[in-house]
């Protein structure tokens, strides 16, 4: 349920008309991506893959989803989520991603430091 019962299509139209901005839809499935594009999204990202009830047993990045989206959609597809190495970023681009978002692998240094601390403090 959206605020004031607005549909995604109406929200996207408002963003386009009133703000003159492009809209990226974060999705977890091909079906959601198709719906987003039909509602007017200018691009779609694999951002929610692995983080929703329907995909919680999957681990990002969703390379299979990315490949399907690239083949079936006529808008740019962004690979976002779970990119933890340059090789993974290259694979996403090779599969046809318009762009790749690298987040925690670069900005999450604190998580990496904690993991090292935890492991190295065992049995001391």
What is the predicted role of each segment?
Residues 1-16, 30-35, 51-70, 86-90, ...:
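Active-site-adjacent beta->alpha loops and helix N-cap segments on the catalytic face
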Residues 3, 24, 57, 80-81:
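Residues that cap or flank secondary-structure elements
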Residues 14-28, 71-80:
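Short beta-strand/loop segments at the ligand-binding rim of alpha/beta enzyme cores
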Residues 17-20, 42, 67, 71-74, ...:
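Generic secondary-structure signature for well-ordered alpha-helical cores
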Residues 29-42, 75-79, 83-102:
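Catalytic cores of alpha/beta
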Residues 42-49:
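Non-cysteine beta-strand/loop elements that form the S-adenosyl-L-methionine
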Residues 49, 98, 105-106:
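Flexible glycine-rich beta->alpha loop in the catalytic core of nucleotide-sugar glycosyltransferases
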């Amino acid at each position: 349920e959206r605020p004031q019962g607005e549909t995604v299509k109406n929200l996207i139209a408002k963003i386009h008309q009133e703000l003159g901005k492009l809209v990226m839809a974060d999705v977890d499935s091909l079906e959601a991506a198709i719906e987003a594009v039909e509602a007017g999204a200018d691009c779609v990202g694999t951002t929610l893959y692995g983080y929703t009830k329907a995909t919680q047993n999957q681990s990002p990045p969703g390379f299979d989803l990315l490949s399907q989206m690239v083949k079936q959609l006529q808008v740019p597809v962004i690979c976002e989520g779970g990119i933890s190495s340059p090789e993974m970023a290259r694979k996403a681009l090779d599969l046809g991603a318009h762009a790749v978002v690298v987040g925690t692998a670069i900005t999450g240094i604190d998580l990496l430091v904690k993991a090292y601390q935890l492991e190295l403090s065992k049995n001391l």
